[in-house]
Amino acid sequence: MAKEDSIRMQGVIVDTLPNTMFRVELENGHVVTAHISGKMRKHYIRILTGDKVTVELTPYDLNKGRIVYRER
């Protein structure tokens, strides 16, 4: 997946799932399942319920995404 093909949206973590997966409610109201990107995993960035995050979605599957940034 090329970076220019991805869709970035803001959201809030609603639920924590096993295997570092999270349920994220996007700003438009949709709920998606997202995992942490590799750089966030490498730097041990912790994500908790209620955190504001930026999620990358692919145009092919809008139900799954990748968390690329956590707001401070």
Swiss-Prot record:
Chain ranges of the S1-like domain: 1-72
GO cellular component: cytosol
Residue pairs linked by disulfide bridges in the UniProt entry: none
Keyword terms: Cytoplasm, Initiation factor, Protein biosynthesis, RNA-binding, rRNA-binding
Subcellular localization, as worded in the UniProt entry: Cytoplasm
One protein family per Pfam: eIF-1a
GO molecular function, one term: translation initiation factor activity
Entry's family note: Belongs to the IF-1 family.
Subunit comment: Component of the 30S ribosomal translation pre-initiation complex which assembles on the 30S ribosome in the order IF-2 and IF-3, IF-1 and N-formylmethionyl-tRNA(fMet); mRNA recruitment can occur at any time during PIC assembly.
PANTHER family documented for this protein: TRANSLATION INITIATION FACTOR IF-1, CHLOROPLASTIC (PTHR33370:SF1)
Function comment: One of the essential components for the initiation of protein synthesis. Stabilizes the binding of IF-2 and IF-3 on the 30S subunit to which N-formylmethionyl-tRNA(fMet) subsequently binds. Helps modulate mRNA selection, yielding the 30S pre-initiation complex (PIC). Upon addition of the 50S ribosomal subunit IF-1, IF-2 and IF-3 are released leaving the mature 70S translation initiation complex.
Protein name, UniProt field: Translation initiation factor IF-1
Originating species: Halorhodospira halophila (strain DSM 244 / SL1) (Ectothiorhodospira halophila (strain DSM 244 / SL1))
